[in-house]
Every structure is written in structure tokens, then in C-alpha cells.
């Protein structure tokens, strides 16, 4: 069984900080289909549309009938562990620094045999000579059939952002998330120090509570106007892990000063600050509202990334609680403009594009950039929209889950799930539907 992770001791500041070495990440275009699914928390393999054979590894033609009609399809993941090996030596710097490392062969119920990283709670299979029989503990005689070692195969993104397969035990254990190998594939908040950029909103306060519940060591909570007493702030500041800090994303000096104070300690940045005004182009004269949205939603992210990004990248291999992730609260409106909230949609589309740049720049350091695309949030700016809407607590829960499972793109809520499905099916049709009112 996995032993619970103990809180690491404070690092000696005199010691050199390790630099990040990524695992091998070269993948062909076809194999990136598995990465695309894993980025959203799904395990998919190619299935031949002619003979229904499941393919592994990814390929351009079916291994059975040579058909090129292969479709990425979700898999259940059940299988039997055939063999395992423990890596005690590697010439690859990433694995060399993390030995020993378990690997295994799993014969999936769907057909193919796959190579997986093995979770520590998966028991070792019997030797081939012993397969199919149990032995008497006294004299070693065969007493009956031995149970196969069952595993559940799931897809995760490794530190380089490439999809890998992991063999999990069929049932979750108490400290399963503390497995050394699994923590290298995820951004679990446990014992990490987190910055939440805006604590005055219901979403921000729900995030703080969810992160504390997930085991965060310290949660710094940004407040642009610390002299104001806003509802809910007293509740979160009463938590021993929480510290309120001055942070105004419209003010470059404010961001720089806070980065100088805590930037070298932050392990996870959660940028939830946003301005949302329900206007289109013609519903309000002037550019003041649109400028305010862009100043926070786009330029705020830019200021934050320029100041906190370098330190985050520099600590991405700094022990068991290394810097791990950057979370951007975007909107499903970023995918296709929603005219009643047109300027807000435009600001989030700009932020989405910038977040893709941030992800590309963070990837060489192994920092995961998580983009969250919720549907309408149940707050004052969506008051007149009918349900379903995403509650702040549900949104916070989805973000913490993404951190724990190493997911890159999250679409919380029924509306977001529906919109992204329609967008993938035909972006132009969705544009026309939204222009016509939905």
C-alpha cells in the first residue's frame, strides 16, 4: 500500500535548486490523438471502423485488416497484468533522477497488450510457472486456481505534456494519490503553496476552501482593495492556511511587488480574477467596459505570467512539492462569441490565445497550464440567464480535480459540455446558432 506523503522539511536555501529534465516527449501526429484525449481526462485508443480491432500503439493502418479508417474511441481500461519490471538504471536524466520506477505489460480486455507505468498499489503478478495455481504455504503443493492481477489502465499526461498509460489498482486506496510516480504526472495541491488571484468573489472563496480541503500548505489570496470588508472574506481569512495579500492585476507595480515577495515560494498559480460585463457592441456606447474587461482578463494574465512565470519555471524540479501548475479561469464563450456578452467573450478569447502561448513556454519546464472553460457561472453577472448554471463550489471542485488528475482542459457544467461538443462538430454552425440566440 502507498504510504501517506509526509510534509517535506523546509529546503536549505544554500542548496542548489535542481533543474528540470523532461521525459522523452517525441510523438508523431497520429499518436497525439491519445494526448488530446488525455488532456481532457479521457483514455482513448484507435478502433478500426471496418473490423473493430482496437489498436496499440497508435498507427495509420489497422494491424488486422490494413484499413485506414481508425477512430479514437473511449476505452474502459480493464485488463490483466502479465508482467512487471522495476527500472533501477536509466540513461535518461528524467528517470535516472526518480529511480526505482515500475513498468508493466497489461493485456486489456479490449484486445491489445499495452505498456504502462505501474502504480505502487498494484501487486506483482505470479511468475509464469505459477500462473493459474495457488500453492500451500507449508509444503508448496498446488491447491487451486490463482487469481489474475487485475488493473485499470488510464491515460495521463507526463511532465512533458505527452500521453502515457498508467496501471492503477481496480479499487482506490486511501493514499493512492500520494504514489511517487503518480505525483510526477499530476499537480496535486497537497502540501503545496497556492496563489489565488482574487478572493473577493464567490468563485475565489470557493476555490480557497477547496484548496485548503485538498491539503494545500499555504493559500495566498489576492485582494485588489484590502481596505474593503467584503462578504465571505472573514470566513476564509479565519482559516490558518490562508493569507490575504494585496494584488491588483491592472497595476503592474502591484503584481511586481507581490512577485518579489512570494514569487519564489508559489507552487501553483490560480488566476481567477476577471471582469464580466454583459454587453455586445451596440448595447453600450464607448469602450470603457470593454477596456476594463481586457485590462483584467487579458492584460492581467499577461502581467501575472511575466512576473510569476520565471520563478515558477525555476522551481519545477524542487523536491516532492515542486512548482507544478498554472490555472486560468477562462469561459466557454472563448471558443465562439456569445453576442449578448460579446465584449466579455472577446476578452476571454484573447486570454485563451495567450494561455496557449503560456502553455508552450511553460512546457519545457514541466509546468502544467490548465485552462478552465465553464459555462455561465451562478453569479450576479449571469442573473438573467436561465439555468443550468455552474455554482462556484462545483467550479472549484472541478479545478481541484483537474489538478489532482493532471488534466489540461476542463469544461465544467452542462452548458460548457454541450457548447464544446457543438463547437467540435461544426464551429460555423455554432456561430450561426449563437447569433440567432442559442
Where are each of the predicted segments found?
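Conserved glycine-rich cofactor-binding loop
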Residues: 200-201
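Conserved glycine-rich Rossmann-like NAD(P)H-binding loop of the short-chain dehydrogenase/reductase
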Residues: 215-232
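Rossmann-fold cofactor-recognition segment
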Residues: 236-252
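Conserved mid-core segment of classical short-chain dehydrogenase/reductases
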Residues: 256, 274-291, 314-321, 340
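A short, exposed helix-loop element centered on a Lys and neighboring polar residues
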Residues: 305-306, 356
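Catalytic loop of short-chain dehydrogenase/reductase
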Residues: 318-350, 355-356, 360-363
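C-terminal helical subdomain
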Residues: 371, 379, 383-424
Amino acid at each position: 500500500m502507498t504510504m501517506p506523503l509526509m510534509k517535506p522539511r523546509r529546503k536549505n536555501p544554500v542548496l542548489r535548486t535542481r533543474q528540470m529534465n523532461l521525459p522523452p516527449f517525441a510523438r508523431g501526429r497520429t499518436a497525439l490523438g491519445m494526448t488530446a484525449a488525455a488532456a481532457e481526462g479521457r483514455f482513448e485508443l484507435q478502433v478500426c471502423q471496418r473490423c473493430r480491432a482496437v489498436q496499440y500503439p497508435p498507427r495509420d493502418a489497422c494491424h488486422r485488416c490494413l484499413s485506414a479508417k481508425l477512430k479514437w474511441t473511449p476505452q474502459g481500461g480493464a485488463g490483466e497484468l502479465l508482467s512487471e519490471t522495476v527500472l533501477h538504471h536509466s540513461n535518461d536524466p528524467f528517470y535516472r533522477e526518480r529511480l526505482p520506477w515500475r513498468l508493466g505489460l497489461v493485456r486489456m480486455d479490449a484486445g491489445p497488450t499495452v505498456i504502462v507505468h505501474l502504480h505502487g498499489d498494484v501487486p506483482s503478478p505470479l511468475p509464469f510457472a505459477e500462473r493459474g495455481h495457488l500453492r500451500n504455504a507449508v509444503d508448496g503443493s498446488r491447491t487451486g486456481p490463482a487469481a489474475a492481477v487485475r488493473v485499470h489502465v488510464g491515460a495521463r499526461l507526463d511532465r512533458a505534456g505527452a500521453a502515457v498509460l498508467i496501471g492503477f489498482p481496480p479499487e482506490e486506496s486511501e493514499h493512492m494519490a500520494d504514489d511517487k510516480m503518480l505525483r510526477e504526472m499530476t499537480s496535486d495541491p497537497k502540501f503545496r503553496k497556492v496563489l489565488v488571484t482574487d478572493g473577493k468573489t464567490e468563485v475565489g472563496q470557493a476555490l480557497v476552501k477547496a484548496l485548503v480541503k485538498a491539503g494545500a500548505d499555504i493559500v495566498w489570496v489576492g485582494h485588489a482593495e484590502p481596505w474593503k470588508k467584503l462578504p465571505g472574506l472573514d470566513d476564509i481569512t479565519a482559516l490558518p492556511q490562508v493569507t490575504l495579500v494585496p494584488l491588483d492585476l491592472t497595476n503592474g507595480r502591484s503584481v511586481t511587488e507581490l512577485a518579489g515577495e512570494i514569487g519564489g515560494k508559489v507552487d501553483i498559480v490560480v488566476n481567477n480574477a476577471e471582469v464580466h460585463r454583459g454587453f455586445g457592441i451596440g448595447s453600450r456606447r464607448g469602450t470603457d467596459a470593454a477596456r476594463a474587461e481586457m485590462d483584467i482578463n487579458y492584460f492581467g494574465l499577461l502581467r501575472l505570467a511575466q512576473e510569476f512565470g520565471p520563478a515558477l519555471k525555476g522551481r519545477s524540479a524542487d523536491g516532492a512539492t515542486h512548482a507544478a501548475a498554472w490555472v486560468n479561469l477562462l469561459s466557454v464563450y472563448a471558443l465562439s462569441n456569445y453576442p449578448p456578452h460579446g465584449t466579455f467573450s472577446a476578452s476571454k478569447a484573447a486570454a485563451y490565445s495567450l494561455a496557449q502561448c503560456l502553455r508552450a513556454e511553460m512546457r519545457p519546464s514541466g509546468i502544467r497550464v490548465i485552462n478552465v472553460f465553464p459555462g455561465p457561472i451562478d453569479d450576479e453577472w449571469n442573473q438573467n440567464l436561465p439555468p443550468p448554471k455552474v455554482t462556484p463550489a462545483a467550479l472549484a471542485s472541478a479545478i481541484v480535480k483537474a489538478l489532482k488528475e493532471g488534466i489540461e482542459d476542463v469544461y465544467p457544467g452542462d452548458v460548457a459540455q454541450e457548447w464544446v461538443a457543438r463547437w467540435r462538430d461544426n464551429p460555423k454552425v455554432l456561430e450561426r446558432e449563437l447569433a440567432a440566440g442559442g
